[in-house]
Design a protein with these regions (language model features):
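Residues within well-ordered beta-strands of beta-sheet-rich folds
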Residues: 73-81, 134-136, 155
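Ligand-recognition surfaces built from glycine- and aromatic
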Residues: 119-163
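Acidic/polar loop patches that form or flank catalytic/metal-binding clefts of enzymes
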Residues: 88
Length: 163
């Protein structure tokens, strides 16, 4: 038996004419590819999860690609409380929380948008080892649209108990 087949617990992406933020949850203790759940950014309502037997996939935010700021640095401040799972019982003990602020310069002025406002959400895996950060470009289907992005200034911090 091999554990495999999960989608990332948190993904920022571009697809079907949208920029989106997606949260995925898997409460199964040992998961495989037989139970797949992946919400479609084009068809999904914001904060309405698509679910399967053990998994949930939720679009926390989306905006049309035409409205997304371009040719500038964009800073995302992301605060996450991961969902707490019941290990072998495959239950959800406490839902997670997601908060995202997007900021950038436009016409010489600072723009700051609170795009996901402390939303209760299912996010994470039933895995006591925790999570790690990874980024990359994943092409969907036969897309040949040129993409360029940079990552700089990435930081992780423990949330203070006063938040």
């Amino acid at each position: 038996l091999i554990e495999q087949g999960g989608y990332p617990p948190l993904a920022f992406g571009f697809s079907q004419g949208y920029f989106y933020i997606k949260a995925n949850s898997d409460r199964k203790w040992l998961t495989d590819k037989t139970d797949r759940c992946n919400v479609n950014p084009d068809k999904a309502e914001i904060m309405k999860p698509v679910t399967s037997t053990y998994k949930a996939s939720t679009i926390a935010y989306k905006m049309p690609f035409d409205s997304f700021p371009k040719d500038c640095w964009i800073t995302f401040r992301v605060d996450i409380d991961w969902t707490l799972y019941g290990k072998e019982k495959e239950t959800i003990l406490k839902p997670g929380l997601l908060d995202v602020i997007m900021s950038y310069q436009q016409a010489g002025k600072e723009v700051k948008k609170h795009i996901v406002n402390k939303e209760e959400i299912l996010i994470g895996r039933n895995d006591e080892e925790g999570y790690y950060f990874k980024f990359g470009i994943y092409r969907v289907g036969n897309s040949t649209i040129p993409v360029l992005y940079n990552l700089a200034g990435y930081e992780e911090h423990e949330k203070s108990s006063g938040k």
